[in-house]
């Protein structure tokens, strides 16, 4: 069996690294999107409540009373931050997918060269 050229091994390592990064980005993006859905649902429910409704938020092991407006503002701020995270991760996802495509093309070229060299060696004997 032929030895794998260092250039091909390097490309394969870079490809695997980029794939792992993409998986990490996708996981974080999914987590933020799930939290964003929860925040949207909470905002929707709180907006239905009367102005003087008692609202409590969890702080560690305690429930602390909060005004409706303060709760809404806190949730809207959180929503804005989550949307920013999702947008940033979507950009990273796009860049990583492009990087993976380029690395895949490079890997295929290197493999084609390697196969071509092996075919020439077999045919030339």
Swiss-Prot record:
GO CC annotations, alphabetized: cytoplasm; prefoldin complex
Top-level division of the source organism's lineage: Archaea
Pfam family, one: Prefoldin_2
MF GO annotations: protein-folding chaperone binding; unfolded protein binding
Gene3D superfamilies to which the protein is assigned, alphabetical: 1.10.287.370
Biological processes annotated in GO: chaperone-mediated protein complex assembly; protein folding
Key words of the record: Chaperone, Cytoplasm
Principal subcellular localisation of the protein: cytoplasm
Subcellular location: Cytoplasm
CDD domains tied to this protein: Prefoldin_beta_GimC
Purpose: Molecular chaperone capable of stabilizing a range of proteins. Seems to fulfill an ATP-independent, HSP70-like function in archaeal de novo protein folding.
Database matches in NCBIfam families: gimC_beta
PANTHER family registered for this protein in UniProt: PREFOLDIN SUBUNIT 6
Family per similarity comment: Belongs to the prefoldin subunit beta family.
HAMAP family the record matches: PfdB (MF_00307)
Assembly mode: Heterohexamer of two alpha and four beta subunits.
Protein name: Prefoldin subunit beta
Source organism of the structure: Pyrobaculum calidifontis (strain DSM 21063 / JCM 11548 / VA1)
Originating gene: pfdB
